[in-house]
Structures are given as C-alpha cells and as structure tokens.
C-alpha cells in the first residue's frame, strides 16, 4: 500500500508547503481536485496541465487520482433531460482527458447532488445510468484511466448508489473496463458495512481507496477503526493507494496541524510511509 493525500486538505496557495510535508511523511503521490489546476479545468490549457504535472512530479509526488470532478457545477446532473446529460458527458470527457494529461489513472466520481434521482424510479434511474457510464467507461478505457464510482451515503445528500454493495453491483452491470469501484472508509462507517466483506466483494474492478472519516473530518478523529481497515486491506492483498481525504477545516483551525495528525495516524495504521512494509 502506498500513501497519497487529496489536495483539498490544504489551501490552494500552500501546495509547496504541503508537498514538503507529504514527502517528509513518506507519501508516494497526490490526489487532485480539477478546480485546483485552473478555474475552468474542462478547458485547461496544455501548458498549464504540463506545468501542474511537473510541479508535483518534480517533488516526487505523481498525481495518482482526481476527485471533486464536478465541483462548482451544480447545473450538470445525471437525471435531468437528455440535454443535461449531454452537457454532463462533455464535462466528464474533458475531465477524463485532463486526468490523462496529468498522468492520473483514477478519477473518483462522487458528486452526490449531481446524481440525485429525486422522484425518478430506481429502475429507470439505473437504466439511464448504465447507458451513461457504459459510454464514459469506454472513453476512460481509451484514455488509459479508470472512472471510479464512489458510494455516497444519504448523509451526503445522495439517493443513488449510496453504499458500497450498490456500487459494486452497478459497476458489474455496466461491465466496462474503464469503469471501476472506489471504496471509502468514512462511507463504510456511515452505512455500517463490513469492510472485509465489502473488499472481498469488490473484486478486480476495485481501483482506489480513501482513508476518511464521516463528514471528511480529520482522519483519526471520527471513530473509524483505521487499524481494522488496514487489516482488511492486507487481507485481500490490496496494493493500491491509500489516499487521505479530508477538508482543510473551518476558519480558525490549522490545516498544518490537521494534516500532520492525519498523516501520523494513516502511516501508523496502514504502514503506508515510503519504505514501510507493503500490503
């Protein structure tokens, strides 16, 4: 297992300082929100993509994943009309291309409010979503990346694919090589799922993992048993990234202290520091 951290854990102007902290704690990669690349990431200039990728790689931290794919775009919804889905598809294709340009092989599709089905029946919603993600999975496969579906519990305002088993079954139904499963420790805690059982069920389509707490609190502060999660990961032979996902905290809190604390917790529980024993 290798350590990565999402850059939503620090301010946009603190990348250099955060990178130093990550390297000091043995991180092997960074996860990125597209809006941190530029204001309109779906139109990111090639020069900016190259420079942003180089910034992280020069520090020994390749970009391993993208998350918050639809941040700032509440207008892009999966279960609107055909025109709305076309706009959503165009956005996600652009972000898939951005991921490929950044060298990120995984994209985490969470976006709970963009995929609310509301009054739409579940079967109808699944039919729409299967066709939509089958096409996007093909695009992702062609670009050499995986679009990974993240379970979003109802506590996050979601009502479609709210737990890990639903995501696993959905990805299997789509059956597209470019579509993967993403698992999240905070989500599993909220849905009261058994991590060993879920990890065993996820199978070969499982592509990425977030070490998180409910509500994206500081990792180690929310009651998730990360030592038990790590044991489950080792039990299934997980060899991917354990990516820390948490916010930088409310005003008046220190993102540095939060990040230092989380990195210590994750390395102790998962053994993810570079040079530590692998899974």
PLM region spans:
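Histidine-acidic metal/acid-base catalytic patches
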Residues: 1-4, 9-26, 89, 103-104, ...
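Active-site-proximal loop/turn and secondary-structure-junction residues that shape catalytic pockets
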Residues: 9-11, 34-36, 69-72, 113-115, ...
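Active-site acidic/histidine proton-transfer and metal-coordination neighborhood
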Residues: 16-17, 58, 75-180, 190, ...
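Short amphipathic alpha-helices and their capping/turn segments at secondary-structure boundaries
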Residues: 16-23, 42-62, 89-103, 130-139, ...
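Residue-level detector of anion-binding/catalytic polar loops
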Residues: 28-29, 62, 105, 146, ...
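Glycine-rich, proline-tolerant flexible connector loops at the mouths of alpha/beta enzymes
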Residues: 33-53, 111-113, 117
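Short, flexible/disordered intra-domain loops and linkers
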Residues: 38-43, 157, 252-257
């Amino acid at each position: 297992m290798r350590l990565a951290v999402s850059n939503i854990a620090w301010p946009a102007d603190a990348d250099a300082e955060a990178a130093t902290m990550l390297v000091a704690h043995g991180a092997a990669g960074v996860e990125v929100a597209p809006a941190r690349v530029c204001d309109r990431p779906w139109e990111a200039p090639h020069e900016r993509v190259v420079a942003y990728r180089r910034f992280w790689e020069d520090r020994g931290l390749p970009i391993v994943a993208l998350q918050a794919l639809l941040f700032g775009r509440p207008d892009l919804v999966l279960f609107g009309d055909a025109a709305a889905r076309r706009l959503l598809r165009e956005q996600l294709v652009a972000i898939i291309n951005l991921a490929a340009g950044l060298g990120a092989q995984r994209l985490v599709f969470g976006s709970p409010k963009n995929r609310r089905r509301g009054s739409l029946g579940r079967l109808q919603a699944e039919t729409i979503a299967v066709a939509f993600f089958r096409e996007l999975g093909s695009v992702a496969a062609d670009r050499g990346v995986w679009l990974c579906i993240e379970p979003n519990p109802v506590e996050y305002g979601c009502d479609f694919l709210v737990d890990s088993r639903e995501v696993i079954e959905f990805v299997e139904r789509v059956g597209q090589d470019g579509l993967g499963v993403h698992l999240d420790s905070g989500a599993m805690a909220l849905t009261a799922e058994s991590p060993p059982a879920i990890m065993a069920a996820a199978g070969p389509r499982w592509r990425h993992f977030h070490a998180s707490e409910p509500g994206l609190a500081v990792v180690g502060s929310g009651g998730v048993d990360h030592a038990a999660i790590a044991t489950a990961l080792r039990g299934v032979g997980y060899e991917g990234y354990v990516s820390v996902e948490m916010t930088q905290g409310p005003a008046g809190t220190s993102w540095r202290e939060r990040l230092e604390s989380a990195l210590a917790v994750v390395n102790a529980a998962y053994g993810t520091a570079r040079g530590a024993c692998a899974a």
